[in-house]
Amino acid sequence: MTPSLSPVSPAWIAEAGASLGFDLTEADAERFARSVNAELDGYAVVDDLAPAGAAESVDVADVHHPSATEDPHNAYITRFTLVDDGADGPLSGLDVAVKDNLAVAGVPMTCGSRVFEGVVPRRNAVVVDRLLAAGARIVGKANMDELAYGPTSETSGFGPVTNPADPTRVAGGSSSGSGAAVAEGSADLALGSDTGGSVRIPASFCGVVGFKPTWGVVPRDGFVDLAPSLDHVGTLARDVETAALGIDVVGGYDPRDPASARASQTGVGTCAAALAAAPDAADLSLGVPDELLADHVSDEVRERFEAAVSTLEAAGATVERVAVPTVADAVYVWNAITNVELAAALRRRSLPLDRPGPHDLARLDATAASQSARGVGFGDVARERALVGAVLLDRYGGRHYTRARNACARIADEFAAALNGHDALVAPTMPVVAPELGAQKPHSYGDDDGLDVPLAFNTRPADLAGVPAVTVPDGGDGLPVGVQFVAGRCEDRTVLQVARTFERVSDT
């Protein structure tokens, strides 16, 4: 029998009441303390009804932190081998890396933070089970920016990920290791998460394909959120077909994530097969948003992008300029949502209140213990962003958050208008090539030193609108440059077909 819960004092009740917006008198606090304590004893039965339980039966082999010799780009936090020997499916023979905010039973999950060392999930994320059932061999947990907050990898508690194209430069973030692992060849396919571009940024910088599907296509059970209303799980691979195949496997409805009900509208499960019907370039109509090709784009990237567009036009594609005006303010819309949702998650000890369960109690228990100091041990970026969210919540009642959520609908409408008559929108994925290590400002504001480039300017809008987006290498010489294609909500197959067409013409 689990021991009874400890009683609380009137002072604790007064403090808790204030945090809930209650104006309690001293007499109120004493009265509520008595009634609350009288009820608390009964909750011990819940622990007995649903104990934490043992880990799933998994055969994870050789779990270890790799050496610099084994992992020259620091792409992995943990290496191991996990395969279902009885499975034979579309991913058979492929090595897969998963970002370290996705649970693998029996393997540490850090979310790129030293704060979470010691968290060992008892069961797999649903996407991990789907990978194994499809025959994949999972080879490691990929390094990432702390809490998935950062575009360069430099906030990781386990050190930055270097770029296989040039080890003096960043790999991008926050799915840093996922991009580097695919680019260096240690993985054929990788899973990442994309809240403001975190699949597409490292894919572009490392010269691989990165696909962020429509929001909700991939269920997030067993995934540690940054901002639940914007988080997407996506794929990185060396070609469009493998990225599409990965989404076919991990996508689709799961009752543990109600948002995944949308997957049935997207054709997930047939994305790779649909590539056979990718149109000729002469049948494509594309729009280039003015706002995504403005002064923030470097001359080098602009020239490479315009060359890619010229390749499409030479193959017969129609390309014209369009407008998506609100994306110019997307940074504050995105920040208002992400910072508030991060602060709220830290306050509630990352409890998945929006998921029906069942939940991995090992992760929740360890997370609660790790966060007992309310953020002590996190890096400056995570703490700064959470504090901004706390200010917006506590001093301004969350009104900026709700208005930002409303602005997402406006951005989605503008994307729909720009896409009217076009198969997809096309823009540079990133405004610059991968910066050198240490060159990018670590914070959003307030630093006088370092490169100040809005790295996620062109990627955030698709997350805010919830629409599918894919980055494909431009095919040019020099450091990698990605070309991003964006389609309408639930048009995942369409955007992948367009990407395949570009891949085909840029290879010739």
Q: Where is each model-derived feature located?
A:
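A short, well-structured catalytic beta-strand-centered motif of the EAL phosphodiesterase domain
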Residues: 96, 483-489
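Short, glycine/charged-enriched secondary-structure capping and boundary segments
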Residues: 110-113, 152-155, 204-207, 301-303, ...
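Short glycine-enriched, charge-decorated loop/helix-capping segments at active-site entrances
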Residues: 111-117, 441-447, 485
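Residues in well-ordered alpha-helical elements
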Residues: 241-244, 402, 493-496
